[in-house]
Every structure is written in C-alpha cells, then in structure tokens.
Amino acid sequence: MTLEQELRQLSKAKTRAQRNGQLREEAAYCHQLGELLASHGRFKDALEEHQQELHLLESVQDTLGCAVAHRKIGERLAEMENYSAALKHQHLYLDLAGSLSNHTELQRAWATIGRTHLDIYDHCQSRDSLLQAQAAFEKSLAIVDEKLEGMLTQRELSEMRTRLYLNLGLTCESLQQTALCNNYFKKSIFLAEQNHLYEDLFRARYNLGAIHWRGGQHSQAMRCLEGARECARAMKMRFMESECCVLVSQVLQDLGDFLAAKRALKKAYRLGSQKPNQRVTVCQSLKYVLAVIQLQQQLEEAEGNDLQGAMAICEQLGDLFSKAGDFPKAAEAYQKQLHLAELLNRPDLELAVIHVSLATTLGDMKDHRKAVHHYEEELRLRKGNALEEAKTWFNIALSREEAGDAYELLAPCFQKAFCCAQQAQRFQLQRQILQHLYTVQLKLQPQEARDTEIRLQELSMAKDTEEEEEEEEEEEEEASEAPETSELELSESEDDADGLSQQLEEDEELQGCVGRRKVNKWNRRNDMGETLLHRACIEGQLRRVQDLVKQGHPLNPRDYCGWTPLHEACNYGHLEIVRFLLDHGAAVDDPGGQGCDGITPLHDALNCGHFEVAELLIERGASVTLRTRKGLSPLETLQQWVKLYFRDLDLETRQKAATMEERLQMASSGQASRSSPALQTIPSNHLFDPETSPPSSPCPEPSSYTPRPPEASPAPAKVFLEETVSAVSRPRKTRHRPTSSSSSSEDEDNPSPCRPSQKRLRHTTQQGEVKIPDPPKSRETATSSACRAAYQAAIRGVGSAQSRRLVPSLPRGSEEVPAPKTALIPEEEYLAGEWLEVDTPLTRSGRPSTSVSDYERCPARPRTRVKQSRLTSLDGWCARTQAGDGSLNAEPAENPSVPRTSGPNKENYAAGQPLLLVQPPPIRVRVQIQDNLFLIPVPQSDIRPVAWLTEQAAQRYFQTCGLLPRLTLRKDGALLAPQDPIPDVLQSNDEVLAEVTSWDLPPLKDRYRRACLSLGQGEHQQVLHAMDHQSSSPSFSACSLALCQAQLTPLLRALKLHTALRELRLAGNRLGDACATELLATLGTTPNLVLLDLSSNHLGQEGLRQLVEGSSGQAALQNLEELDLSMNPLGDGCGQALASLLRACPMLSTLRLQACGFSSSFFLSHQAALGGAFQDAVHLKTLSLSYNLLGAPALARVLQTLPACTLKRLDLSSVAASKSNSGIIEPVIKYLTKEGCALAHLTLSANCLGDKAVRELSRCLPCCPSLTSLDLSANPEVSCASLEELLSALQERSQGLSFLGLSGCSIQGPLNSDLWDKIFVQLQELQLCTKDLSTKDRDSVCQRLPEGACTMDQSSKLFFKCL
C-alpha cells in the first residue's frame, strides 16, 4: 500500500469517527496519521495532526493521552529544529506523567528530553546541552532499573535499555569518554540483537560506524555500516538504507576509492531520502565524486603525452579537493602541478601562483611551517612587485603567528609587509597590516602597541588619493565541473529501469570487474569486499552456502576488513553453516586480516554470545590459547563479554556462559579431551595464501588482482543519523592510512574485486604435465646419494606436498607398516629419454584421464612463477662434480641441444651425472610472538630444522623489540621438536605460536651494547658508565645528558625486564613524542617501578596520549607512586590525556607539572574528565602546578576538583597570570576552608601577593589546623603588617607553623621585641631575606634564641630553625 493510500484510508476512518462523535477514536486516528506523516518526512503536517489529537484528548480529560500527545508534539518540533518549543512540550509531558505516578511514561519523558538536548548539541555544539542530555538519560535508566524491573516484560525493558544505552553512547562520544562510549554501544547492540529490535540495532550500528569513521577506523566502520544496511533491508526502510549508502560513500572517499563511492551514492540516490535537503546533498556529493573521477581519468591519459594538460588538470583537482575540504589530497595535487611546472620550465610568476595555492592549502591543514616555506618561495619568484611582496610578507606574518613564533620573528615580517604596502601606495592594505600588528602586540608586546595605535590613527585620517585595487575576480567555474543531474547517470532508469527485483540489485553489488583481464567468477565482490559466500553466511542461507561450495567457491576468502566466511557465520551464530564450512576445510583458527585485530572465529563467536558455535569450533580443533592483538585469549574474551552484559543476561544464558568458561579453562589447561578435526575432504593447497582458499573443483579458474599503494587519507568531520554532510563542504583532518581503490573497468557501477591493498599479488600458473614412463629393462647404474637428494629437493618444490596431503595417512596403531616407496625414479631405472615435460603453459585443451591420478592433476599455484627445464636435457643449468670433492658448481649451458660433459673422462650426462635445478620457492612461515607477527622465509635448498626457525624468530623479535627471547614453537597446540625438518611439520603460510620460555638477559651494560649494535647506534660513554655502575641498583639515572631519541632507544631497550628497577630518572633529555612508544614498551616490563622522572624531555600532548593509550589495560604504571612531567610542552590540550594518566596510575602519590605551558584555558576543555580523575586519585598527596600562568579562574577550577581530604602538599608558585591578577588568593581560601581539608604544606611564592591578600589568608588559618608550612617568598609587596597578621592569627590555633618563608618580601627592620617573641613562640623555622633588615634584628635573634635552635646570619639573609 502506498503512502497516499494509507493516508486516504486513515482520513476516512478519522472523518467517520468525527461524524459519530467518537472523540477518543478520532484522536487515535490523528495519532496514527501524525506517525505516518512523520515517517515520510512531512513533519509540519504531522505536527498539525498531533496538535489536533491534543485538543481532542483535553476535551475528554484523558491525562495520559494528553501527556503522550505533548511528547509527540515535542518530537515533531525537535525534528523541525524548534528546540525551545519542543522542550516546553516535553516538560509538560514529564509533569503530567509525574502527576499520574506513571513510571513508564516518566522514563520515556526523560529519554525524550535527553534526545532533544542531544539534538541541540548537534545543532549548536553546546557542552551544557550534552551534560543535560547525559543527566536526563541517566535518570531515565535509573527509573528502568529501580522502578520498572518486574513491572514490564523483559522485552520491553530490553527495548528501553537498548535505546538509552545508544543515547548514552552518543553522549559519551561527544564528551570524549571513549571507554564508556564503547561499553554503551556494545550493550545496545547486544540487547537489540537478542530481542530482534531492528530499528534500534540499525541506529546503534549506524552511529558506531560513524564513530569508527571519524576515528579513522575504516574497516570497523564498513562492517558496522553493512550491519546497519542489513537491518534497513530487513525492515524495508529505503531511507535508512540510503543513509547507510551515503556514509559508506564518505568512508570510501576517505580511502581514495571514488569509483566505489560513486556506486554507493548512486544507490543512495535511487533509494531516495527522507528530507529534501538530504537528496540535494546526495546530488552534490555525486557531482563532486564524478568530477574527481573524470579529472583523474583525464590526468592518467595526459601524463603520458601532454604534461601541459596534466598540469592544468592537477590544478583543477587541487581546487576541487580544496572546495570539498579535502586538503591533503589538494596539497598532493598542487605539489604534482608544481613538479610538472618545474619540468616544463614555466615562468616564475606561474610558479609563484602554484606556491600560493600550496601555502594556502597547507595553512588549512595547520601545517604553518611548510606554508611559510612556500610563501618564501613565492617571494623569491615575485621580486620587484611591491604589492605582491606586501601581501606575501603579510601572509608569512600570519602563518608564523599561527605557528606560535615569538614576537621577535613576527615583527620584522609585519614591518616588511607595511613598507611594501607603502611603496605600492595601498592604504587599505596598510591599515590591515597595522591592525593585525596591533592585535599581536597587545598579546605579546603591549609596550609597543601604543606606537602602532598612533600610526593607525594617522593612517585612517589620511585621504586615499588612489583607487584601491579591485577585488580579484571570482574563480570561473571549472570546465570539468559536473553536469546537471540528468547527465550524471542519476536516472532511475540506468540500472533498474526494467523493474529489477531486490535480488537482482544485490547481484549487481556482487558483479565482477569487467575490465581488460578475465577475473575469476568467485572473486566478485560488493563494496565491502564480500563475496557470494560471505553474503550467504551473513544471511544464514545454508542451501546457498552448500551450492556455492559444491560449485567450487573458495572457502577462505577475505573481505576488505579481513573477515572470512567462517568469521561471518560465527559472528551471526549460524551453527549449521559453521558445521558445513568446517566439514569442507575452512580455516578454523584464521586470525583475520589487518583490520580484524587477530580475532579468530572462536573469539568472534564468544564475543557475540554464540556458545553452541563456540563449542563446535572447540570440538573441531580451534585453538583456545591464541590471543588477539589486544592480548585476549578466548577465555578472557568470554569473561569480558560476561562482565559487560551480565546485568542484561537471563539465567539460561548465564548458565551457558559459566559452562563455556569451564570448558575453555579445561581445554586451555590441557585437561579436556580435544576432539580431532574432521578429515578434510577438500584440503587446501599449502602454497596458497590464507586470503583465498583453493576451490573444491580440480581445475579452478585462477584469480588475480592489482593492488594499489597506500596513500594519505583524511579523517572526516562528524556525521550523525539522519543528517549527512556534503562531501563538498566537510572539514578534514590529515591522517595516513591504507587505502583501497578500484581498478578501471568498463562498467563503473560494478564493484571491483581487485580493490583492497592488503591483498597479496597472485600470478596464475599451470602445472606442467608429468609423464611417468614404464620402467626400463636394463641400464647402467652410477648412483650417488647426493644425486637423489638433489632430485628430492627439486620435486618437493614442484608440488608433491599437495599430493602427500591428499593421500590418506596410516593409522597410528598399525603394526604392519608397508615399506615406503619413493615417488621418484631411481637413477638405475630411469630412461635416458626426455621423460619430464617442460613446465610451460600448455596449448592443448585437455589430457587423457588415465595419464595421471586426480590428485596429481590438482594444480599447485606457487606465489612466483618458476620456469622448470627438462631434467634430461641441458636447457637450463647443469652441474659438474669437481675432482676431489663432491661440490656442485652450476654453469649455464653453452649449447642447449648438445649434452654437456663433465669430469676428466668427459662422460655424457646420460651416464649418470646429476643436474642442479632452479631453486624452488621458499616456504613462508608466520610466527606469532606475543603481539608481534613475523613472516619468515625458509629456503628449501637446504633442509632447515625447527630450531633454525626458532632462532630466526627470536632474532627478529630482538630487532623489533630489543629483547632476545628463548622460544618453543607450537602448531595447533602441538609442540614442534627442534630437530624436525621444517617441511615435514609445516607448510607455506602456516602460522605457529611461539611461547616465550625465558629471556636472554645478560648484564645491563652488555644489553645496552647489544641494543646499540642491533640499531646501528654508537655507544654513549656516559650512558655506558651509568649502566656499569647502576646495574645492580634499584634506581637508574641518566639525567641531563641531552640524549636524542636515537640515543635513548637502546637505553630504554636495555632496561626492559630490569625487574629490580624501582626508580627511573631521565630528566634533561630529548625523549620527544616519537620515543614515547619505546618508553611505554619498557615500562610495561618493569612492574616494580615507583618513581618516574621525565621532566624537561620535549614531551608533548601526542607523546602523553601515546603513553596513556598504551598503558590502558596493562600493568605498566599500576605501582607508580611519583611522576614528574615538569618542563614539558604539554599545553592546555592535554587535559583528557592527563585525566587518563591519573586513572592509569592508581597508586600515584606525587605529581609534578611545573612549567608545562598551562594557561587560563586549562581545565576548560576537559573539566569533567580531569575533575573526576583528581577526585578518584585517593592516594595523591603532593601536587605541583607552579610556573603555569593559570590565573584566578583556572586556578579556581583546579582547586574545586582536588581531593581536599587527602592532598598534603600543594605548590602554586608563580601561577598568577599577571600582576593585576589580584583574585588569586580567593580560590585558595575556599580550598583551605573546605570541610576535612588535610593540606599541610602550601607554597604561594611569586604570585604578586600584597598585605591585603595575606590578611585574608591569615583569617582562614584557624579554620585549617592541618596547615603547618606556608611559603610566601618572592612577593615584594608583603610587609611587616602581613607578618603581624599571620602571627596574630596563629595565636588562635593550638599550634603554630613549622615553616614560614618570607624571602624576597618587604620586611623592614628593626622589628619590635614583642614581634620577635611571637615569632619564637609560633614558628619553628623562619626565612627572611631582605636588604631592609637591621643589626638590631640580628641581635634580637641571638638574645632570644631558644636552646636547640640555629641561625644563619649573612648579609641580607636571616634564617633560624629550631632543631
């Protein structure tokens, strides 16, 4: 039924109810009409229906109905972006629900209010709206947990929780609370899947995909969006599916795959949009994408023969990318344009224009240093043009200002710009330059601002006698701009004009690339890289899976994320499909591709709660010890899943989880009787990569693809549900990520099967036909063991391993073992004729079926094509046995038709001389050592034992991580013996697990030398001396050595696993952000570390973020008690990282953040995160924030969040932003007067305090009896009056101060005797340092000095202390 038919039907029913006076019925039809209209984007009409519904229900005094009507009116107003009116109606809904004590409606009211505040945040980015939204959602969730449990069905409760978790996840994502965000989304998706809530599942997956996209995690984003798209299809909601396609196109654009992005946008266009502006957005995005594709194709054609045209196209591409906000691609295009212009020797002025484009684009990318470089190049190319020089110098000054350069570097640029503008007599430009210079001087050099202001006034009074330069003409529209919609292949008739069904549309997604090369039919993929088998496994179509496998579909292909069909079947819980795939040889322990984080099918099943599937995998031999890249075993994955969802699990599921946990524990400890894997009836060729399994048919068509290199991709701005952002206007961020791009095809609507760059290159080969001759009757024998070994090595490389796997193995308990028969013909039996054909592609169409057996005909595809020569002719290389030794020397044949002779007797090769064949390709073995995976080639020319592989893996790990492990290797849980030959136990592309049994840890000095040697870094003598003298000490110090990152790396690697280390001091070096990961790796191996000093190490926000992210979930900083990050340029933006760091160090008692570049903006961006972190730091005793120009407001925010009951020492030296910042003492007094304040030591030196401030401070001393030490030094406006005030206030306390510092204050002598008496009574230590002290003061101290006290009296210093 169409929309118009439904509307007519409901309108008739509404009219009938109106005639009959049935007001409630009429209101119900109004409600239904409003919902239907709103679902199709007609919000204004829907609003009128709900308003009519409200009037009708008010007339019959239906309070609950009125409440619901207010909710619907509020929702419609919110959709029309009238948020104030929407909130008014929603609060009326809340009040009415409260008056009825209806907890269900109260829950919905709070949830609706929260969603509206979330929409307000999306509209105006107000943080206050976010906090209100979070509070509303939490109230709603509390009602569900506390009031509605037991009142509603489990499904209704799950539905409420699903939506609340989703909304809380969105709120936490905007608040940058990543961990909470991920947990909420996981809970929402889990509940939606369990209860088949497809609309909520769609929203959760869609939003999670958008979050992954914004975070640059394209693989995860594509998988989430595909899941959302499946939900939209299941609900037959075309608009929702259209939104998914739009977001998929954005992801693909970021990856540089504009052909695939075009296909996704065309699908979105055909599906339609709920809002008219969304359809306009899709059209604009499609125009942009098509323009890019057109220009890229023109550029590819022009690069070969028309460099001038290519240069123009590069400029058009750069302009197009710039307008779209894709600045990295724009910069790349302009850079290419510049390169071509230099090759063509274009004029200087033309080169200067390109440099301007590059500089502007780099400025948009916030890379102001490089922008300055290009402006300087423009300046060099435009000598003599005063006006252009003025503009360029002005741009240089602005870029340097953005880069944060000092005033001394900015001022000359402004001055040169102003002088050039004067020469060009451009008064308006002069005013602009002086105005900006004036603004800069107010911030950086206030004393010079007055002169600039005077010059500005003089300039504004002067009359401009010349006409100002006209505005630059607007850029003409690109010649290659996309044509109108009708020309852009947007027509509904292009791909589905014949009324194709949904199934045909899905088949269109899986069409192969119709390019120049013939492509394997099984390698057809959709935009996600999914094959037909992937789709069948996702949709649970067992019959389809069976048909595909029987027809020869590969079993283990990967999609673009890296998932195999078995992964998908396990993820969706299709037990019978999993069973079928395992029966036919699917890889049970496949860890997935690069985007899968090492998740095996068992991990996937457990992470989705499919316990029957997990049980089947374990029975079929799945490893229970393999870990993901995050270090999680299957058992830990299950425990994490139970912990996350425990509250939402029913009793049966909890019991199943407990049973599975016991099963995994028994299996991992070796107590479970593990079922042997079923015999693989269709085994994979061991020379295949795991990305594509061999087909089950004997002679499959080979697949091929062309990989593209990775390039820089931008991370886009935020996109929310039901609100897509045009590709022409979204801002970008610069990131480097692997991209996937489609290869060219004749029909661009067909997805390409050869897109993802992570796939490995494959070549198609055909195995040569082998003819086995009849045994000869007689022959001379001259056999040697060396000859047979050479043959065996050669034939092993040809593909005999595949045949061995196909032959059934003997039972282990068999007593009668038949004599082994060699697959080779002994030299004494073979014929001298040419019995082995050349292994080149054959031209004949077929072979007799009786020539060889089936398994001998099965192809073996090596990775690299190897041309094999005939064994009985000298077409390639032959070997000669030198007299006196048995070595083989290979030489090229001089005449391929004449047999070569060797040896002194010149015997013909037919008499028994061996041949040296071309070396077979090496076996590749993947070795997993903890979180590192190494691919190690094993040459087959010499049979290597497993011990050799172990040594190679250990050396590679040492080269990468700096630690030399002692390893044992396991394959599928079986221990590999060191003496076994590698080809006998492993096949190419097998993955083995290396278990670290111990570490090779020589003395610290030797470890440092070994690390320097492996890194090619020279030894630093002072570090070597420190290593020698501190090797057995629990403390290691390498301070003030100015070690650069290259010199610090071997030092940090040498300290790995130095478990005795408790204190590490690296102050005064150049660690920087780049070395943070190396430091983290070392900290992760020193669990007993309690002190870490990283002060003055050039550590910035990025380095701190890396330390925090790497230490999350690990024990790297768990025992740390003292951390010094002073004198590092952390800046105001480090708030989130600092909060995470505090949470990662639960035992931290001392934190020093002196001179870290904090300003008045500190705490503004991440106040909630930092506040919560400080409040949770229950062990924090000492905090230093000195020498950060916080100012009074920022200091107040800081002190509000500090734990008053536990903090003992607080250093706030020199935190006043300026001399006029007189309110610095007020937040300190508020903190001291807090209930339970435990502060004992307070430092307020160098804060421009005066007598008034000290007077206010002294009044609060009786309220803070814990304070025993006060440092007010370096405050020159503090006089004797302040000292008297302090002493008087101390008399009101039960005890005085143990320390009072007044050095650098204006204490003038002589002090009267009463004052000295108070000093000796109330103070145990006093420091005075002022030139105004007199000799009488010194005499008074000597006369009144109590026993056990000492003094220091020298020049202007007067210190005393009671011992």
UniProtKB/Swiss-Prot annotation:
Region feature Disordered, mapped onto this chain: 460-511, 662-786, 841-866, 883-909
Compositional bias annotation for Acidic residues: 465-510
Signal peptide residue numbers: none
A GO term, aspect molecular function: histone reader activity
Each ANK repeat, start to end: 528-557, 561-590, 597-626
UniProt-listed Gene3D superfamilies: Ankyrin repeat-containing domain, Ribonuclease Inhibitor, Tetratricopeptide repeat domain
InterPro entries: Ankyrin_rpt, Ankyrin_rpt-contain_sf, Leu-rich_rpt, LRR_dom_sf, MMS22L-TONSL_complex_comp, TPR-like_helical_dom_sf, TPR_rpt
Skewed-composition ranges (Pro residues): 692-713
TPR repeats (start-end): 27-60, 67-100, 107-147, 162-195, 202-235, 242-275, 311-344, 352-385
SUPFAM superfamilies reported for this sequence: Ankyrin repeat, RNI-like, TPR-like
Listed Polar residues bias regions: 666-684, 842-853
LRR repeats: 1060-1081, 1088-1108, 1119-1140, 1147-1168, 1179-1199, 1206-1214, 1238-1261, 1266-1287, 1296-1317, 1322-1343
Subunit record text: Component of the MMS22L-TONSL complex, a complex at least composed of MMS22L and TONSL/NFKBIL2. Interacts with the MCM complex, the FACT complex and the RPA complex. Interacts with MCM5; the interaction is direct. Binds histones, with a strong preference for histone H3.1 (histones H3.1 and H3-4/H3.1t). Interacts (via ANK repeats) with histone H4; specifically binds histone H4 lacking methylation at 'Lys-20' (H4K20me0). May interact with DNAJC9; the interaction seems to be histone-dependent.
Domain note: The ANK repeats mediate the interaction with the MCM complex and histones, while the LRR repeats mediate the interaction with MMS22L.
Function recorded in the entry: Component of the MMS22L-TONSL complex, a complex that promotes homologous recombination-mediated repair of double-strand breaks (DSBs) at stalled or collapsed replication forks. The MMS22L-TONSL complex is required to maintain genome integrity during DNA replication. It mediates the assembly of RAD51 filaments on single-stranded DNA (ssDNA): the MMS22L-TONSL complex is recruited to DSBs following histone replacement by histone chaperones and eviction of the replication protein A complex (RPA/RP-A) from DSBs.
Protein name as catalogued: Tonsoku-like protein
